[in-house]
């Protein structure tokens, strides 16, 4: 094996199979490109991105880990979002949640408009 070499199996690997997914239209209303990483709580993404933040609550991009989606100024694109899994805890980012996504009235208390 060569360092960095990929050894792939013969069967396809489907990422995020069986996850509840939604499609959301996103428009970059800003004057600079915006990138959002694969595991970022999408509802807290850059304020220049216009989309349904309530629908995006508790979700992330349905893309391979370690990658990102890029939104150029003025661009409109549809992205697929899946639910965050695991403990469903979000800390930091734009400080809208800072805890468990599903706790009591966390959705109502979260500032779903990015700062």
From Swiss-Prot:
It catalyses: urea + 2 H2O + H(+) = hydrogencarbonate + 2 NH4(+). GO terms for cellular component: urease complex. It is an enzyme of class 3 (hydrolase). Heterotrimer of UreA (gamma), UreB (beta) and UreC (alpha) subunits. Three heterotrimers associate to form the active enzyme. One of its GO terms (biological process) is urea catabolic process. It comes from the Bacteria. The keyword Hydrolase applies. This is Urease subunit beta. InterPro entries: Urease_beta-like, Urease_betasu_sf, Urease_subunit. Coiled coil: none annotated. The lineage of its organism: Bacteria, Bacillati, Actinomycetota, Actinomycetes, Micrococcales. It comes from Arthrobacter sp. (strain FB24). HAMAP family: Urease_beta.
